[in-house]
């Protein structure tokens, strides 16, 4: 005889961008079924390859969508609920199924649809089905129904399936997808406070009469006169959706319970001992849990179990708000937390959800009047239970379609050294649980297989709780007493062991920074075992390293790095109960990081990410090996996978930074080339070449440890995009109470440049006024703001098109002279290179000005949101950040050694004179550039002339770098005589003018400071004292005058105003200078002769050479025949420091120099004269 039953499932679907949820629905109150008039919402089609493929089937009845019942609703209402579900929809469906009341002895073929479903990870939202099934004796959408599955937590005490293993999650999420291979022989899951959802096979679900399949006799199960106690009992398969679905069916309370224990899920040939046992369901209630044994006869058989979980209130504080409210009780099952369904939610996620409630916690609970969950008795562990755990594999997946490979544990000793198997393999099993990430680690040992074989041969049912195996008691041991300081820090119940490290420490570790580091296994015969360390001990300190809050990878590396033979001092504390809870819940590492480099996907299980993404690391020793972390991507969609560990990440980041630096060097070269060139085309070309290498360097490490916190101050605001300058001005003008523009200042105190940097002190002062600081800075400065913990709100205006930018700017700022093409290109480059800095993006629409309202709303929303802040100070930030980064680079300043015009969206004409704007045509290439505003990155026209590609002016630029000349903005007045006076000067005036400048007495100093590039002889002639008014115009016949000469002194011809050519002026001054030089040389010669005559007259006073001086014949042609004029003592201006020429050789050398200058003429080497800066 067949009877129709209904199995209920909860499915979580993720919407595909192209195919939606991949289902079609029909039915409804306004569209009943044409044959039987059924008004249920029915799945009419499932798209192959879609999100629902394999999860939903045709003719499934939709019971609930995201908590909204779908019973007796309109078709349009159901469609609307699916459409507004967003990206994720939790759908509860019921599926019809016919069963045989008296099944044949042979087992039916296993239906593919009844196989155990792949269980999603706690962060994977693809599939979460509740294994609720009910039996209906009426039509497909109503009637009295009976549950064919039961939860051990909510069942009657004697109906609960208590698996005898260490898996006591106590309210934790523990979902297990059980696969087909024989690694799933005897799964035992005891989850305190969790429902274990199970999908059962044909041959086991509705098994033989007398067999205790799932803790209930099938004869009694199909008998309509079943025990009335079950008729009044709970439906033990609980999930929020299933509970709501049962509320809509009045007779769903008639549920026959099934024990979830695996010990009564039998194979095709049931045990005669079990069939001969009296029906346990008919026995009175008992608090004693039952044991169930499942054994496979074939490798492809399934257990058919799906494990679920639910959160309940375990304890309430008497003085807390929950107790005072009076609506909550211990044992209540929490269905929703602030609107989020808690089915299969882990305690960690539930805690975070409560922490984010911000003072308002809304709960939806189900009252458990029997308080079944909190009355669960504690059970002791047995050896066989621990062995059975090794065969339970968690099919957690990184993505819905990928299965995680079986894990292996990491040995902390050498690779060729393995921990020995314990006789009872109990400790070995717990050792294998040392990999504590987000999921438990599956293990299999030979002891487990032997246990299975022995049990199968004995054919003894294990439905009773076996007494716990006696724990071996260690001999009394006296531990070292910790120091008083350690006792004060770590507590009094600590023990200290000290031993010498051998080949390895001999320890396996479990846990992580979230729960602590625990000893998960000890190698036999090692010093650690001999000194009394035990499994379950929490390691608090090793030598001088504090292990509290240490991630498991760092703990492993620290133990490995201890040299062999060195003393190891371990401070530990026995916490076996906490250790068992850690093994049960799978907790270990848990911290958040933000990436500051880019990583591509290496393996199918890896995650690809870019800069600025946030991850939660749940295991730093994935698969028991160093090199990868198991992490969950934090964002709109949660995704789990592998990322490089810290050391590998730093290597990858350093390579990327080096590549960026090399690209930056090329950019600097092209920038300087563009600045040296005065041609517009070359300048534009250099900009285009430069933009390809633009990238933002950072001071952050590869991984930055972050925490989610609320900003307690008004965060600065930085805007990027083609209308950012207009937006900044508009915010400052219209909302002065909320926004204030941070003024830019010159970087150097004495600089006269109009723009430069924004001081951090300025930003701080604006924040102290409770206002948002509006910053006009570069992307690199934004990175510095984040580094200094200011967390700016960075908003990017995304333009729709170049024409749209032009239209908006002409409407918002008609007087603007910026190029829309350039602004549009810069916005696209920013979006490619600096998108990780943006906290929000506003899409511009040139047809309206709604962007301003969006801008204000975005800033307000961003200010109220929590931000990812650095967990601690960055390295190098121990000092006051003002000492290291006291300013931010303004948009007008150079950015990354590049022309800021490549990045800046806040420029005016930028030296382009309208030729690069939307309002004027291009000017000729030779037209000088006109800048409307002077800024640090924009040279003015005068400075542009410096960069003309002429080799001689560049030489003058180098020589013009004399400290005296740069220090003094203008030369002394004596060096700027009026040209007419210079023409009529007599010899005495020329002499006075030449002597009026205060020269240093040392000729070498004169040559070093003022005759740059001249002769390097030790005693040059004092001809450098000639007037310099002719120097500024004595240059090659180039059309561009030397800027240095213009800065040092104005040319005489500019003051004269005479309409003479440059060549004529040069000839005039050449004649004048030549005449003055000859006169000066003659005066010096006469003075020297006078000194010699005086010395010869008074030999007792002056020491002079005896040899008579022979005058230079070349000099006589220039000397005058007039008698020497009497002069005063020689001026110190031209004297040697010794007072006179101390030797005849020096005097002779000096005269030869004068003669050589007379022969060559002063302008025989005009470049030497041009290089003289006076």
Curated annotation (Swiss-Prot):
Domain SH3: 588-653
Domain of life: Eukaryota
Residues with the Phosphoserine modification: 107, 127, 130, 140, 145, 147, 151, 173, 195, 217, 239, 309, 382, 384, 390, 399, 408, 414-415, 483, 686, 886, 897, 904, 950, 962, 970, 990, 1052, 1131, 1143
Domain PDZ: 10-97, 291-369, 493-574
Domain Guanylate kinase-like, chain residue ranges per copy: 679-860
Compartments (UniProt record): Cell junction, Adherens junction; Cell membrane; Nucleus; Cell junction, Tight junction
Region (Disordered): 125-290, 391-430, 456-490, 904-1065, 1100-1174
Gene Ontology BP, a term: cell-cell junction organization
Biased composition (Basic and acidic residues): 125-137, 146-214, 220-235, 243-266, 274-288, 399-430, 940-951, 978-1000, 1150-1159
Membrane topology designation: Peripheral membrane protein
Residues with Phosphotyrosine modification: 558, 1102
Keywords from the named record: Cell junction, Cell membrane, Membrane, Nucleus, Phosphoprotein, Repeat, SH3 domain, Tight junction
Modification Phosphothreonine, positions: 439, 889, 909, 917
Gene3D superfamilies per the UniProt record, alphabetical: 2.30.42.10, P-loop containing nucleotide triphosphate hydrolases, SH3 Domains
Disulfide bonding pattern of the chain: none
KW Nucleus (keyword) present: yes
PTM annotation, UniProt: Phosphorylated.
Keyword Chloroplast: no
Region ranges (Interaction with SCRIB): 1172-1174
Subunit structure: Homodimer. Interacts (via PDZ2 domain) with TJP1/ZO1 (via PDZ2 domain). Interacts with UBN1. Interacts with SCRIB. Interacts with OCLN. Interacts with SAFB in the nucleus. Interacts with USP53 (via the C-terminal region). Interacts with claudins, including CLDN1, CLDN2, CLDN3, CLDN5 and CLDN7. Interacts with CLDN18. Interacts (via N-terminus) with CTNNA1.
Function per UniProt: Plays a role in tight junctions and adherens junctions. Acts as a positive regulator of RANKL-induced osteoclast differentiation, potentially via mediating downstream transcriptional activity.
Protein name: Tight junction protein 2
Lineage: Eukaryota, Metazoa, Chordata, Craniata, Vertebrata
Gene (name only): TJP2
